[in-house]
From Swiss-Prot:
Cofactor binding note from Swiss-Prot or TrEMBL: Binds a dinuclear copper A center per subunit.
Protein name: Cytochrome c oxidase subunit 2
NCBIfam families the record matches: CoxB (TIGR02866)
Top-rank taxon: Eukaryota
Entry-linked InterPro entries: CcO_II, CcO_II-like_C, CcO_II_C, Copper_CuA, Cupredoxin, Cyt_c_oxidase_su2, Cyt_c_oxidase_su2_TM_dom, Cyt_c_oxidase_su2_TM_sf
A single GO BP: ATP synthesis coupled electron transport
Subunit: Component of the cytochrome c oxidase (complex IV, CIV), a multisubunit enzyme composed of 14 subunits. The complex is composed of a catalytic core of 3 subunits MT-CO1, MT-CO2 and MT-CO3, encoded in the mitochondrial DNA, and 11 supernumerary subunits COX4I, COX5A, COX5B, COX6A, COX6B, COX6C, COX7A, COX7B, COX7C, COX8 and NDUFA4, which are encoded in the nuclear genome.
Enzyme Commission number, as recorded: 7.1.1.9
Residues that hold Cu cation A1 according to the record: 161, 196, 200, 207
Residues that hold Cu cation A2 according to the record: 196, 198, 200, 204
Length: 227
């Protein structure tokens, strides 16, 4: 999860988030090189006394600054399209969980189990236990098996919401009347926090998400105790 004064991305917990982190670094390096080149050219233009008053055109330069940006855009677009495909693809998910956004809480339904559904509300600051995080803890965590593909179906009962867990590379809009899909795979156990990422009203900031990723046997025991 995030910590105070953090400048970078959260530690990746899923293959998708690892790919997104690499793509971020790849794109950032390209932007850095372009910015450095532009600043260098501007500095040279401001400091040099040389002029080219007789130059009416420079086709070589025009060709370069047309072809080079096109090549750079391709270098950014290809890995981006690959990641978008990976985020949208899901084959034979082990589990499907339906997530519904409400003002201002989340409800979850494990569609592969009978009567396994619950609401998830934020725990008030006055009820927090030592070591728990303000505005991030919930009364019912979403328990899921690690290292297995999980399909999240996201929608809303009222207004626009957004179901987001940064460390897993997840951010899916919850739209009334529409069912969106996201793929979730956690590479390690633990608690992973998120929040509603779409302004949805007065208590938008009080819609946390907590995923508890556990080994498969522990998940099956939890599911049996809940049904």
């Amino acid at each position: 999860m995030a910590y105070p004064m953090q400048l970078g991305l959260q530690d990746a917990t899923s293959p998708i988030m690892e790919e997104l982190t690499d793509f971020h670094d790849h794109t950032l390096m390209i932007v850095f090189l372009i910015s450095t080149l532009v600043l260098y050219i501007i500095s040279m233009m401001l400091t040099t006394k040389l002029t080219h008053t007789s130059t009416m055109d420079a086709q070589e330069v025009e060709t370069i600054w047309t072809v080079l940006p096109a090549v750079i855009l391709v270098m950014i677009a290809l890995p981006s399209l690959r990641i978008l495909y990976m985020m949208d693809e899901i084959n034979d998910p082990y589990l499907t969980v339906k997530t519904m956004g409400h003002q201002w809480y989340w409800s979850y339904e494990y569609t592969d189990y009978e009567d396994l559904m619950f609401d998830s509300y934020m725990i008030a600051t006055s009820d927090l236990k030592p070591g728990e995080f303000r505005l991030l803890e919930v009364d019912n965590r979403v328990v899921l098996p690690m290292e297995l593909p999980i399909r999240m179906l996201v929608s809303s009962e009222d207004v626009l919401h957004s179901w987001a867990v940064p460390s897993l590379g997840l951010k899916t809009d919850a739209i009334p009347g529409r069912l969106n899909q996201a793929t979730l795979v956690s590479s390690r156990p633990g608690l992973f926090y998120g929040q509603c990422s779409e302004i949805c009203g007065a208590n938008h900031s009080f819609m946390p998400i907590v995923l508890e990723m556990v080994p498969l046997k522990q998940f099956e025991s939890w599911a049996s105790s809940m049904t």
